[in-house]
Amino acid sequence: MTAMRCLAVLAVTLLTGAGAAAAQTAMPAAGVPHDVATRRAATISGVRYDLSLSIPAALAAPLTGTTTIRFALSDPSAPLVLDFETSREHVKSVDANGKSAFAYVNGHIVIPAASLVRGDNAVRIAFNAGDASLNRNADFLYTLFVPARARLALPVFDQPDLKGRWTVTLEHPTAWQSAANGAELERTTAGTRTTVRFAETQPLPTYLVALIAGDFKVETAERNGRKFRMFHRETDAAKVARNREAIFDLHARALDFLERYTTIPYAFGKFDFVAIPAFQFGGMEHAGKILYNASGLLLDESATQNQMLGRASVISHETAHMWFGDLVTMRWFNDVWMKEVFANFMAAKLVNPSFPEVNHELRFLLSNYPAAYEVDRTAGANPIRQVLENLNEAGSMYGAIIYQKAPVVMRHLEALLGEDNFRDGLREYLTRHAFANATWLDLITVLDARTPVDLQEWSRVWVDQPGRPTIQTELTVTGGRIATLAFRQRDPRGRNLVWPQQLRIAIGQSAGPQLITVEVKGPVTDASVAAGMPAPLYVLPSAAGWAYGNFRLDRGSLDYLTSSLPEIDDALTRGSAWVTLWDALLEGQVPPAAFLDLTLRSLPRESDEQMTSRILGYASNTWWRFLNTAERDTRAPRFESLLREGLAQAKTPSQKAAWFGTLRNVATTPGTVGWLQQVWAQKEPVPGLPLAEADFTALALELAVRQVEGWSGMLQTQLGRIENPDRKGRFQFVMPALSAEAAERDRWFAALQDVGNRRREPWVLEGLNYLHHPLRAGEAKKHVQASLDMLWEIQKTGDIFFPKRWLDATLGGHSSKEVADTVRAFLKNLPPNYPERLRNITLQSADELYRAAEITKNK
């Protein structure tokens, strides 16, 4: 037993008056352990928080506050555990029902049973707020408490199934704006300080509580009798004016759709949203006050179709959370995927009518399958529903499996039940559990009554197990006709699982593909309906963007698609084929050079903007990850010429932006790099493409990493062009990572050891991406080990997506065996207590590196 643990046990013993055994039982472990949370949820109810915070103007000064927590307690026989993971010095006083005894143990305030009563209790705490989840800046702050980070700032019951009603009072500099989940009730000003009192909220879990204060501008609008407010820090008035109506319209449409779909009115009163510069996520669904990444809302004139669709999707996603997550909340974060899958699922339904020109089946395919496969093909794949013993690991549960695989699975479930049964089941589920908590099993119970399908067994494979099936096409042709066609399913992990699903199979014919459908129910699925058809050009079992798996094509189909994919007229079939061929490249079945050549042949003929963007992405990834320098040098003139021609011929600014972005990303020849320098210097226009500040900033960074002549002066000039203080600060932060001087880059990376220098996570990630740019991979490989060593600390101190993104930024520019071996050695030598989820996300991030190193090893 460590000295710290001994002291903690002694403290609790003194408080309870019990013996050592009882004290050991009472002492809470760090984080939010499941056993502590389970006891609290069973004994505590009716929680109310009355929080007052004083926010100083000086960044170095602490926030001071008081909170009174009222609750009913059914069993006062054990000490009460509150979560407040800062330090003992932050706790100024604790008063529980008029008694002041407490201990500070492992990030918890522990109140002795002697201070508690059966029934109503009140605990008043004076404290200095912890900074870790306050996101403080010189002239603004915002809280971000998901998944269990409220305890890093405030004393709370930090678990999703102890919802509380919140009354908040904020005192701050008079020039600042502020907002909380509740509506503003009262505002008073004395000198340079203003105090704002906000209305009590509906019951909320702590991760949905949000406070903002600072130098924000406020836009207001009314739609369908409802008032909306948008807080932002954008200094470009024209950009705000260009975007504001669309932003308000998208929120209003989302609310209207969801109220009609669920038959439940919006439950949280006011509707504010805040555009945060360099926000860590796309958005966060705080009830009554959604936070967004400003760059995803306030688009430039050169925004692509994907960016406009992305804005509509993130607004719809976060609005859907008002029902799925906010109104009904998962009981424990092992079911966090439920709120995310329904938010994505609803977003897809409601965005579609706003973009009638878009092929939405293709969008669903491209938005979900590739990202989900990036995880599910790896040795570190995780199931949709995971086991979670402590909320201090909840952040590592997020990722492509819950955001992208789960919507695919949910669409399969909707098809099993039928749209009406599925919708009615969701309505019953939301009504039954409104303002409360529920589990996946609660939902399955509701849906099970609406179908003869065994949903429990279906869920065991699709939801509870990681990975995807390998599905091999088995085709025989006799006399120019299909003799047999079957599909053999295999579990690559050796568990003998069978993933029940529907295969929608394209049988390629000269007149176009014929679609047949079969149901997978066992290891071998016979497509006897195809017997007698003319010999196919190809067989694509993943057509129609429906089936999920690693589809291994027969040799003839693989050869045809690799040579003639552009001949396929149907965009959804083409999209499915591209996703399948990318899998084939990664498995060594298609040479990277042949794949790149296919992209170059396809791009001039591609008519769908979504497909163009996807093919450009595949081409760029193949270019940097799977070709060596000599191969790039040989192909660069043709590649860049094609991109410049595509840029010239693209018909809309959105299309041109996609071509220009790829050209900027891959340019290496003196001619193209020189032209980009002229564009950055504003001496050469890009006809038909209005370039914004963000475009010139990205150009400056890309040119600097190529060490063009005068790169340092170029960065200084670009810094001077940037007027917005937030964007200027980001550029200044990233600049040293672009330096041609290795020592300066080394100092920049070394500074990231200090958690204070990692607070602006998007800034850090941008710098890391340039530090490890493929053009500098040889010099950057020395930083890989240190980045891996920091991962556990990154997980403890960062927000939910940061560990995976840290790894992706570190490893994404590398393809060498040396770096792959560094990662393997790191994983081999991990201590026994290393978090399994961090090990898994390391395997996920390293998977493409491993494959690239293997594919390129003999080049």
Where are the model-predicted features located?
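Bacterial N-terminal signal peptides
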Residues: C6-G17
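N-terminal secretory signal peptides that target proteins for export/translocation
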Residues: M1-A3
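Long, ordered, helix-rich scaffold segments
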Residues: Y369, I482, A486, R495-L497, ...
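Conserved short loop/turn motifs at secondary-structure junctions
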Residues: R70, V110-P112, T329, R427-A434, ...
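Hydrophobic alpha-helical and helix-loop surface patches within well-folded domains
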Residues: F198, M230-N496, R614, N621-T622, ...
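Hydrophobic membrane-targeting alpha-helices
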Residues: L15-A20, L350
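Acidic/His-enriched low-complexity segments
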Residues: A22-G269, S295, Y398-Q404, A415-D420, ...
